[in-house]
């Protein structure tokens, strides 16, 4: 995809941290999805839910999903550094293979669903930052605009 197209689509939100709505982000992702796929017919909550729960192999061979960190129910908060979330879910594998060197803090993962956290998907810079980090960890690539739009569409259906 051409960088100029991406720049144009996100020109609505020229500065980091400027407010947006989930619907505005979806419109931008729809424009990008349409550029990369002329047969794009809209986002799917079903595909978004499937993507959220799909397991992906990470560096150590284990399988993680979005739900590994963000909770099986995205309307609930979750705390890192407990038995259900392995360190590698957030940190990847340390170079020395030793997680003992990583400080153990109880990082709070706020609810991902906008119905439980009204600030979700209202800052396009923050949204892109975390999609880039999390998709890179799980998929070893950027998420596509279709994948991002599908996940946000599904999360918007949760009441």
Where are these regions (language model features)?
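Sec-dependent signal peptide recognition
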Residues: 1-7
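N-terminal signal peptide c-region/cleavage motif recognized by signal peptidases
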Residues: 9, 14-16
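Electrostatic cytochrome c docking/interface patches
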Residues: 23-62, 73-77, 139
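The canonical Cys-X-X-Cys-His
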Residues: 61-73, 84-94, 151, 155
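Short Cys/His-rich "knuckle" micro-motifs
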Residues: 76-81, 97-101
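Short Fe-S-cluster ligation motifs
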Residues: 100-135
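C-terminal capping alpha-helices of c-type cytochrome domains
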Residues: 125-159
